[in-house]
């Protein structure tokens, strides 16, 4: 509600980016009675909470699950946007080191819920997108500060709309491009750019390997490399999330490669990458896996923040201009943190009126 004496009017807000943070912010702002328009450069929502469906396989090739330890994100998942196919991955995550030694993981972390959906992790973002005004396949390339707020332009220079506030919910590199090319006060622009340049990301190659017959049953759902020296950063048994995700008598492993490996193999042909990754997987598991019957590959340039920047300092500079930022560049690369940050920053924006 507006403070006493303030006239209640519908305020217009543009959100650049339909990832989980931007979607959470959109609902928070709509709940406060504001008009929200989201601009998304792709035809999908959810960012790295992404799901593919190919040849009978359903798999999450970006973020793997949502940690359930947070009150805010858990309320969004279980109460605000409930779904019949929501599941808590039953098996734990174990760990391995450079030598390939596998052992049990942190028992405290493994007690926390690991939320996903039978139909894919992207189910949350698709549910959150319902009822929102989202302009897909629209890359915002330019911002201009006006006396009434902000003018937005797409990457071709065409007008995209006039708004009183703008929330930028994209990776820091894209946000930096928008500010560097934007027309806004010079001192504030440089201060914002200084903050955004402090954020950096790790690249990640995600490789999907389908097998028939199903790989050997393990006491864990996934393995994570804790000393960060192995070529494999993460290896998950995707069919453990839900048997409906794979064709009958098949299994699907998801290998997410370490930053150093991903950089080295970034431009290599897909077939060579898949072949090499399959060898690393078979060696780690010490299991005579057959040749994969299904493969897929995805390059994530901005997979996880290597360095975050101070979102509070950034928004302290930006909010007086009617501008704000949210997302993983400020809180780290976890879906639940992105959801929380979107809600928190949206509340800050609503409080500026």
Which residue ranges define each predicted feature?
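Conserved flavin/dinucleotide-binding core of flavoenzymes
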Residues: 24, 44, 61, 248-353
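N-terminal FAD cofactor-binding segment of flavoenzymes
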Residues: 51-94
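Active-site substrate-recognition segment that forms the wall
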Residues: 208-264, 282-285
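Central helical "cap/lid" subdomain
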Residues: 46, 159, 164-222, 287
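Glycine-rich FAD pyrophosphate-binding loop
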Residues: 30-54
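N-terminal Rossmann-like FAD-binding beta1-loop-alpha1 element of flavoenzymes
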Residues: 11-38, 346, 350
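A conserved short coil-to-beta-strand element within the FAD-binding core of flavoproteins
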Residues: 136-151
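Short beta-strand to alpha-helix junction loop
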Residues: 65-72, 102, 106-127, 267-273
């Amino acid at each position: 509600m507006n403070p006493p004496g303030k006239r209640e009017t519908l305020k217009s807000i543009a959100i650049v980016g339909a990832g989980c943070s931007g979607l959470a912010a959109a609902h928070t702002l709509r709940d406060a009675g504001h008009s929200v328009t989201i601009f998304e450069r792709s035809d999908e929502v959810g960012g790295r909470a992404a799901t593919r469906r190919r040849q009978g396989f359903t798999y999450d090739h970006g973020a793997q699950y949502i940690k359930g330890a947070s009150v805010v994100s858990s309320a969004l998942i279980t109460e605000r946007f409930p779904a019949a196919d929501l599941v808590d991955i039953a098996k734990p995550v174990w760990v391995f080191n450079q030598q390939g030694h596998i052992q049990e993981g942190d028992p405290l972390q493994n007690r926390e819920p690991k939320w996903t959906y039978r139909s894919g992790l992207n189910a949350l973002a698709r549910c959150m997108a319902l009822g929102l005004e989202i302009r897909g396949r629209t890359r915002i390339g330019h911002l201009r500060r006006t006396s009434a707020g902000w003018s937005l332009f797409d990457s071709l220079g065409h007008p995209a709309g006039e708004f009183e506030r703008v929330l930028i919910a994209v990776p820091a590199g894209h946000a930096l491009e928008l500010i560097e090319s934007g027309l806004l006060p010079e001192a504030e622009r440089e201060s914002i750019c200084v903050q955004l340049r402090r954020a950096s990301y790790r690249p990640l190659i995600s490789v999907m390997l389908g097998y028939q017959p199903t790989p050997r049953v393990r006491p864990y759902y996934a393995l994570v490399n804790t000393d960060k020296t192995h070529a494999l950063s993460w290896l998950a048994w995707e069919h453990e999330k839900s048997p409906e995700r794979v064709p009958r008598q098949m299994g699907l492993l998801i290998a997410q490669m370490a930053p150093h490996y991903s950089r080295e193999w970034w431009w290599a042909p897909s077939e060579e990458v898949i072949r090499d990754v399959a060898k690393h997987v078979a060696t780690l598991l010490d299991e005579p896996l057959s040749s994969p019957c299904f493969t897929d590959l995805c390059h994530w340039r901005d997979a996880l923040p290597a360095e975050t920047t101070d979102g509070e300092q950034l928004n302290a500079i930006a909010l007086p201009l009617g501008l704000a930022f949210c997302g993983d560049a400020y809180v780290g690369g976890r879906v639940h943190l992105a959801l929380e940050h979107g809600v928190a920053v949206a509340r800050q924006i609503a409080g500026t009126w």
